[in-house]
A protein has these predicted regions:
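Basic- and aromatic-lined ligand-binding clefts that recognize polyanionic substrates
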Residues: 33-40, 44-48, 137-188, 192-200
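Short, low-complexity disordered leader/linker segments with a strong preference
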Residues: 1-34, 267-269
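Extracytoplasmic ligand-binding site segments that recognize negatively charged/polar headgroups
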Residues: 95, 99, 107-135, 161-178, ...
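N-terminal glycine-rich anion-binding loop in soluble enzyme alpha/beta folds
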Residues: 28, 34-67
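Periplasmic-binding protein-like
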Residues: 85-90, 139, 206-212
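Acidic/His-rich segments in extracytoplasmic proteins that coordinate ligands and/or metal ions
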Residues: 23, 55-134, 217-228
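Structured C-terminal subdomain patch of bacterial secreted/periplasmic proteins
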Residues: 35-36, 119-122, 126, 130, ...
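Alpha-helical, coiled-coil/dimerization segments enriched in small aliphatic residues
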Residues: 51-76, 172-199, 233-241
Length: 269
């Protein structure tokens, strides 16, 4: 009889502990669903999504070619002040315009680093999720992003493109390296220099990866007309669930569509 009571007591305690853990997890998840998040651009919004945020709003319209140049308005400042969290990178013109005023809002500020490498995506998503208490949602989203890049890497290797020499825009080098491409040199984001043009003129570069937000690779084609050019983007054209992985998939698709013959081509995602 005594043994039965002990077993019964242990079962009751186990059930109570399980219920407590479930309630805590549900409470944490629920808390992350009720916060309002606003981001500076579609790129920082995409990181917010990977961090587990939903219904993220943006200040700079996603349709802009170079969103960081967006000039903030009084209405935008009011939107930021009403949000629980504002996610930004720091290089945006709006941050310079607001100056010290941004620190005087009622909004919690989260500054992140924007590059699309797997390592950075994991780090920034974890930073955001920690603040929003949205780790439960972030984990699967980051996993899906990594799968897109890893699958792209396999496709690049299958086509033999990992053996080709690449001259890459500095703002796109992170994804290029994660895809297993051989980056032999970089250019940008400033104007091309004489030495960079001379480097490509020597020959040996099979692919040039340019950046749609400030494309500057055209002069390189004049000195290396048989080199293939693909133009990638960093700022998603939409603000939605999975926007970064969808954009990266388009970048990968554009790369894989490059003709492998001698005809030059310029492909945009």
């Amino acid at each position: 009889m005594k043994k039965k009571l002990i077993v019964l007591t242990l079962l009751i305690l186990s059930a109570a502990l399980f219920a407590e853990g479930t309630t805590e997890k549900a409470t944490t998840s629920s808390a992350s669903r009720t916060v309002s998040v606003i981001a500076s651009t579609s790129w920082t919004a995409a990181f917010a999504d990977l961090g587990g945020a939903d219904r993220v709003q943006v200040i700079a319209p996603a349709s802009l070619i170079h969103p960081p140049e967006y000039e903030i308005t009084v209405g935008d400042v009011l939107k930021i002040d009403k949000a629980n969290y504002f996610i930004y990178a720091g290089y945006e013109r709006m941050m310079q315009s607001m100056g010290d005023a941004i620190g005087k809002t009622n909004t919690d500020l989260i500054q992140i680093t924007t590059d699309n490498s797997i390592q950075n995506v994991q780090k920034q998503a974890a930073l955001i999720a920690s603040s929003l208490r949205s780790e439960y949602y972030s984990e699967d989203r980051v996993y899906d992003y990594i799968q897109v890049v890893e699958n792209g890497k396999q496709a690049v290797a299958k086509k033999g493109m990992n053996e080709l020499k690449v001259y890459c825009h500095a703002m796109q080098v992170f994804l290029a390296k994660d895809l297993g491409l051989e980056v032999g040199g970089t250019f940008g984001p400033g104007p091309l220099t004489a030495s960079q043009i001379a480097e490509v003129a020597k020959g040996g570069y099979d692919i040039i990866i340019d950046n749609v937000h400030n494309p500057i690779a055209s002069p390189l084609l004049e000195v290396s007309p048989t080199t293939k050019v693909v133009v990638w983007r960093n700022f998603p054209e939409t603000v939605e669930r999975g926007s970064l992985q969808k954009m990266v998939q388009k970048n990968i698709d554009a790369l894989l569509k490059l003709p492998m013959g001698t005809n030059c081509g310029i492909l945009n995602p």
